[in-house]
């Protein structure tokens, strides 16, 4: 995973997850991480999928900005022949609207099984071509003008594999005028792990296990990146982020993701929508965009 992978994981979790509450008495840091990982799981009877509109606004400094609007499709599929902790595959399709990127599509297939890598494709309408992003060079391209790469989006990973976690403290933080009780976790990179950062702090909300804030530091103790949920909303009774802001201090880029019109489709999505060979036929208007 590259530099913004952990912050990107939180962003994607905010986009695609329906969360569940869990009793918190006497909980350990590793148990909190397990619950955070479970945010990416959905019930096996949830076969409808989710639609949303996502706007990515990037501020590069010196009055230089960019903005992209994407139509988001998400569907989790299940393989009952596999173990319960490896039976899900999350399919995400992002359709670019407007500007030079009109009609471009990014498709990602992310297995729940940590031993299996995500697969990614990019559809280029001008060429009528779908390209799988396999090499590091392919995956290093900027996603929607941000400091996140395509590879970052495909790197959800397991925090427990790369970091030793402790509960640093408990406190309350404010998000959009409301106060939330959180655990502040300190994640220290394991000596033999290929971790992006030496130290990560996460502010995890105690009821829904949302990562409301994250700070990532290098081995010199310098803050390299941070992420925060700026505005929270509700979807089917659960709290979800509506505005997420990330800062890459190395590149001086501030990216703001706004999620709107989060909804179920009128007709359940099917896995055919996420077929790499059929991306050129996708019509967002058919899904209410």
Residue ranges with predicted function:
Residues 2-12:
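Bacterial N-terminal signal peptides that target proteins for export
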Residues 74-112:
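Functional cores of ribonucleases/endoribonucleases
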Residues 25-46, 53, 60-62, 110-198, ...:
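Flexible, processing/modification-adjacent segments and terminal tails
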Residues 50-81:
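N-terminal, post-signal-peptide region of Sec/Tat-exported proteins
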Residues 97, 119-123, 129-135, 140-156, ...:
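Gly/Pro-enriched, hydrophobic low-complexity segments
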Residues 37, 70-82, 228-234:
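Extended lipid/amphipathic-ligand handling interfaces
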Residues 10-20:
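Bacterial N-terminal signal peptides
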Residues 40-48, 85-87, 236-238:
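Edge/loop elements at the starts and ends of beta-strands within beta-rich repeat scaffolds
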């Amino acid at each position: 995973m590259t530099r913004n992978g952990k912050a990107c994981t939180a962003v994607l979790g905010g986009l695609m997850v329906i969360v569940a509450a869990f009793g918190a008495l006497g909980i350990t840091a590793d148990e909190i991480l397990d619950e955070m990982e479970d945010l990416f799981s959905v019930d096996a009877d949830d076969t409808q999928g989710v639609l949303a509109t996502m706007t990515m606004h990037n501020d590069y400094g010196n009055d230089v900005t960019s903005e992209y609007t994407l139509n988001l499709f998400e569907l989790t599929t299940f393989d009952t022949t596999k173990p319960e902790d490896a039976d899900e595959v999350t399919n995400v399709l992002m359709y670019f609207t407007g500007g030079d990127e009109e009609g471009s599509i990014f498709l990602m297939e992310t297995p729940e099984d940590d031993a299996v890598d995500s697969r990614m494709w990019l559809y280029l309408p001008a060429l009528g071509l779908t390209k799988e992003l396999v090499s590091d060079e392919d995956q290093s391209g900027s996603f929607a003008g941000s400091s996140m790469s395509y590879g970052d989006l495909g790197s959800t990973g397991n925090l427990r594999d790369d970091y030793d976690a402790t509960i640093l403290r408990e406190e309350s933080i404010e998000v959009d005028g409301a106060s939330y009780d959180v655990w502040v976790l300190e994640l220290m990179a394991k000596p033999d792990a290929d971790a992006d950062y030496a130290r990560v702090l996460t502010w995890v909300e105690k009821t829904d296990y949302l990562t409301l804030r994250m700070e990532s530091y290098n081995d010199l103790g310098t803050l390299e990146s941070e992420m925060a949920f700026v505005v929270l909303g509700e979807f089917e009774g659960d709290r979800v982020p509506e505005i997420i802001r990330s800062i890459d201090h190395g590149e001086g880029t501030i990216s703001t993701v706004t999620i709107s019109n989060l909804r179920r489709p009128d007709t359940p999505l099917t896995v055919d929508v996420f077929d790499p060979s059929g991306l050129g036929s996708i019509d967002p208007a058919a899904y209410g965009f």
